[in-house]
């Protein structure tokens, strides 16, 4: 639990029993590093005043928002008002809107940058794996390995199996919303629109082998395009044919719509919420999950006047994640980086006193810490495939500095 760094920990949710179950698992695994407070609280995080009251009651200094993306603005506002640090793992979404005009961060989070700056509030946006770690990978490549970066392709593959006919790995409502709207990518230094499943690629990847992925709209493209001088930034996600077929049928029938409909009995329902209600709870998938995940950045550019390519990536194992945390690897890769971000704020490395996306913060402390927390990073380039080494990063950075890049 890393409470040796983070101190007292309070877990809050609208459903108190979920918090109590988490605490029970932590205590059963004897995961606390030292004696301290580990408490559960019931909270409607959409209620800004209630969130502020809980912050005041617990005297917390860092709030990690691991809830639905619909909650971001309420929790962020409470943190700004109370002067405490804020971390989230995904971009804010309005439940009534799908796939808004890019850049998505400009529609919500970035509107609060001045308020964070004025109050000296540290707000780290998108500190999961993607977004999050992949942003740090992009910054690492740009800072240490290239004189000029021409393209960043972020590749996310779940090569595991949960054994169910059909299920999503996290909240179905959020999951499906990612794929029912326009696919936005950053190409030739401008926004480009495509349809879901319109464009695909196949890569030979470490450990998981040949994988087909599809161009997908995703959070990190919307900050990297603003913060890094890179003309092409794309996100690719792996989908099996079965998933695509079921998704397509649901979508064509209108069952993935967020707009209410009225049944013959006069009952108003949101089709997407009905689908969510009948699908397996993502938490129930973990015990039977097998296989591995791959998430990484394929970066291309120029180094010393020569075209170069770098793959920075992580491999995680579903069964290992369940053994440690009772969660599957997708939840594990999303949750561990957020804890690492909180630890870096507590240590001072990332306590920047303003709003920042992950690529705007030092990448090495983050990547290094994650390696010690169960998410090791590997690098593949012309020199071969090897574990990330912070000393190598420092050496590469000095080399680029000497050449005047």
Residue spans of the language-model regions?
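Short beta-strand element of Class I
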Residues: 8-10
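Helix N-cap at the beta1-alpha1 junction of Rossmann-like dinucleotide-binding domains, i.e.
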Residues: 15-18
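Rossmann-fold cofactor-recognition segment
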Residues: 30-47
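Conserved Rossmann-fold cofactor-binding substructure of NAD(P)-dependent oxidoreductases
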Residues: 42-60, 67, 71
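N-terminal Rossmann-like NAD(P) cofactor-binding module of classical short-chain dehydrogenase/reductase
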Residues: 55, 61-66, 79, 86-88
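Rossmann-fold NAD(P)-binding glycine/threonine-rich loop
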Residues: 89-121
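Adenosine-phosphate binding glycine-rich loop
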Residues: 109-157
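C-terminal catalytic/substrate-binding lobe primarily of soluble NAD(P)-dependent oxidoreductases
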Residues: 143-405
